Amino acid sequence: MVNVLVVGDLMIDHYVWGSCDRISPEAPVQVVNIKNETKRLGGLGNVVSNLKTLGSEVGVISVVGDDDVGDEILELLKDRGAKTELIIKEKGRKSSQKSRIMVAHQQVLRLDTESVCEIGVSDDIISKFENILSGYDIVLLSDYGKGVLSPYLTKEIIRITKKSGKMVLIDPKGKDYSKYSGATLLTPNKKEASEALGFGINDEDDLKHALKMLKDKFKLNYSLITLSEDGIALLDEDVKKFPALAKEVFDVTGAGDSVLATLGYCLASKMSLEESIEIANLAAAVVVGKVGSADASWGEIENLKSKKSGFERKIISLDELLRVDRSGKTMVFTNGCFDILHFGHISYLQSAKKIGDMLVVGLNSDRSVKELKGDNRPVNAQSDRASMLAALEFVDFVVIFDEDTPLNLIKTLKPDILVKGADYTGKKVVGSEFVREVKLIDFVDGKSTTNIINKIKG
């Protein structure tokens, strides 16, 4: 069982559902005829709700007002099975509630009731946090700028968590990210990152600069920016994009909470960062297809994943590939840039498939191709190259690697047979010591990406 400790701003998302077919005679405003009202956890509470749906145990540290809304928040948390004994009621504080007037599944007005000021019980929270941290796998901070995560408290939580060797993930707020310095990663969207860094993110160069600046300036372990309809971007050695999967977007409320919760759950479950981002991306796609703050179940995530086209399902991470059932099957591995797919590639891959039962193609990332072939390559981006390879019926899986050689990939995967071109005759093949056998296949004469590029250039 995964145990997640969350800290931040709790609130209630109050929805007033109605219809509208006339304008008020008193003022030029819509008259909404109320049909129904619903209340659910918002802010940090939505992170909790998402975590519980994923199957996590959740401990909650926060501050609410000593009022009816605060009581409702505590009851809703208890109903979700969260641990609420560490939530402090502060006299004079007004608990947060956001009331949204909804007509035809669209917001027409929002009314907020809340206090926006720093809490006065930071030292009490730090003491509680230190006492219970050992019982949790990971820490998530959800900052909505209402005052719970003051600079002092945030810095202390990061310091204590990192000292314990655990990860701390933060959904940030505001323009000053200095209080988040030293966190494992932040999950800002493009607008938030742009405001915090002081420049617009308008193209790929801006995005890479922003990711690098976030990581370096705030001493993060990893740098990530959510891109709304464009998915999620991660800075490794180069920018890696995880495309968005939502087919219809009804309401983006709470999508950031779902990303934070799902990332936290997956990382606490010892999944790799890339696989965790893939799943968080799916969860966000599920959530934006609903109206109001919502969460994504494993069933919904798997259902959306299964709706990816057949060949797209063949493009997987190394972690996913290691879980593929290989019993009784001979795994054949080959690799390359496959920049401009041509008949020579087709013939080579068909021959490789005939050697065994399962053909895995290791594909050089864009960064890797550029390092090997020069600044003008690749011609086609890694996502396009991977999709074209995966669309071939004789290719079973495509896995992208970022190094110059597939040595680490082969060492981890340990395929049965390693296939290379006949030009490797008499040469040592990278990774050969980790496979049962190396097979060399003749290329089709005159067929190469370089020749095609030169022919196009004239």
Swiss-Prot record:
Catalysed transformations (reactions): D-glycero-beta-D-manno-heptose 7-phosphate + ATP = D-glycero-beta-D-manno-heptose 1,7-bisphosphate + ADP + H(+); D-glycero-beta-D-manno-heptose 1-phosphate + ATP + H(+) = ADP-D-glycero-beta-D-manno-heptose + diphosphate
GO molecular function list: ATP binding; heptose 7-phosphate kinase activity; heptose-1-phosphate adenylyltransferase activity; phosphotransferase activity, alcohol group as acceptor
Listed GO CC annotations: cytosol
Positions of the UniProt region annotated as Ribokinase: 1-311
Keyword Cytoplasm assigned: no
The UniProt record lists the keyword ATP-binding: yes
Region (Cytidylyltransferase): 333-458
Binding site residues for ATP: 189-192
Keywords in alphabetical order: ATP-binding, Carbohydrate metabolism, Kinase, Multifunctional enzyme, Nucleotide-binding, Nucleotidyltransferase, Transferase
SUPFAM superfamilies in alphabetical order: Nucleotidylyl transferase (SSF52374), Ribokinase-like (SSF53613)
Classification via Pfam families: CTP_transf_like (PF01467), PfkB (PF00294)
Annotated metabolic or biological route of this protein: Nucleotide-sugar biosynthesis; ADP-L-glycero-beta-D-manno-heptose biosynthesis; ADP-L-glycero-beta-D-manno-heptose from D-glycero-beta-D-manno-heptose 7-phosphate: step 1/4; Nucleotide-sugar biosynthesis; ADP-L-glycero-beta-D-manno-heptose biosynthesis; ADP-L-glycero-beta-D-manno-heptose from D-glycero-beta-D-manno-heptose 7-phosphate: step 3/4
Class of enzymatic activity (EC top level): transferase
Active-site positions on this chain: 257
E.C. number(s) listed in UniProt: 2.7.1.167, 2.7.7.70
Coiled-coil residue windows: none
Any single GO BP term: ADP-L-glycero-beta-D-manno-heptose biosynthetic process
Function in brief: Catalyzes the ADP transfer from ATP to D-glycero-beta-D-manno-heptose 1-phosphate, yielding ADP-D-glycero-beta-D-manno-heptose.
Protein family per UniProt: In the N-terminal section; belongs to the carbohydrate kinase PfkB family. In the C-terminal section; belongs to the cytidylyltransferase family.
Subunit composition and interactions: Homodimer.
Protein name in UniProt: Bifunctional protein HldE
Organism: Campylobacter fetus subsp. fetus (strain 82-40)
Gene name of this polypeptide: hldE
